[in-house]
Swiss-Prot record:
Entry GO MF terms: proton-transporting ATP synthase activity, rotational mechanism
Predominant localisation class: plastid
InterPro entries: ATP_synth_b/b'su_bac/chlpt (IPR002146)
Subunit structure: F-type ATPases have 2 components, F(1) - the catalytic core - and F(0) - the membrane proton channel. F(1) has five subunits: alpha(3), beta(3), gamma(1), delta(1), epsilon(1). F(0) has four main subunits: a(1), b(1), b'(1) and c(10-14). The alpha and beta chains form an alternating ring which encloses part of the gamma chain. F(1) is attached to F(0) by a central stalk formed by the gamma and epsilon chains, while a peripheral stalk is formed by the delta, b and b' chains.
Membrane-spanning ranges: 27-49
Protein's UniProt keywords contain Chloroplast: yes
Membrane topology type: Single-pass membrane protein
HAMAP family per UniProt: ATP_synth_b_bprime
Source domain of life: Eukaryota
Family, per entry: Belongs to the ATPase B chain family.
Cross-referenced PANTHER family: ATP SYNTHASE SUBUNIT B, CHLOROPLASTIC
Listed name of the protein: ATP synthase subunit b, chloroplastic
């Protein structure tokens, strides 16, 4: 405290304006110089420091606002993406169900088509068998008829002689003549 009062006393004892000198007493001059420098810094630096702090505050607030806007935009995009995902999942489920039903429908169509083809082949087989049976029966009939005819001709040829042959022809001619007279 004594040093502080000494420094104020020394201010009173300073020489007049014509002289300039350095006070080498550090303890006496330092608090005064520091108080003057701090006073000047506070007086002039207050506005600069206030401006710097205001600018910094505005940048931080602007960054926070931008971040908030980006966050809101990201949330909106996320919701849109989730909605699209739900829609795509529903469509995929629908395609899956439709695909299964389409597969079942195609399977039934194929089974029905195969059944119809088998039925048609069975009918064709039956018709072919029936046709072959009829042909075989006709061939057997023809063969039996030919053999019977040959046997009858053989019997007739062995039994017929010229005289019997002439009598048969005459009798037939007589019958035709009688029929002709009846119709005229």
């Amino acid at each position: 405290m004594k040093n502080v009062t000494d420094s104020f006393v020394s201010l009173v004892n300073w020489p007049s304006a014509g002289s300039f000198g350095f006070n080498t007493d550090i303890l006496a001059t330092n608090p005064i110089n520091l108080s003057v420098v701090l006073g000047v810094l506070i007086f002039f630096g207050k506005g600069v420091l206030s401006d710097l702090l205001d600018n910094r505050k505005q940048r931080i607030l602007s960054t926070i606002r931008n971040s908030e806007e980006l966050r809101v935009g990201a949330i909106e995009q996320l919701e849109k993406a989730r909605a699209r995902l739900r829609k795509v999942e529903m469509e995929a489920d629908e395609f899956r169900v439709n695909g299964y039903s389409e597969i079942e429908r195609e399977k039934l169509n194929l089974i029905n088509s195969t059944y119809k083809n088998l039925e048609r082949l069975e009918n064709y087989k039956n018709e072919t068998i029936h046709f072959e049976q009829q042909r075989a029966i006709n061939q057997v009939r023809q063969r039996v008829f030919q053999q019977a005819l040959q046997g009858a001709l053989g019997t007739l040829n062995s039994c017929l002689n010229n005289e019997l042959h002439l009598r048969t022809i005459s009798a037939n001619i007589g019958m035709f003549g009688a029929m002709k007279e009846i119709t005229d």
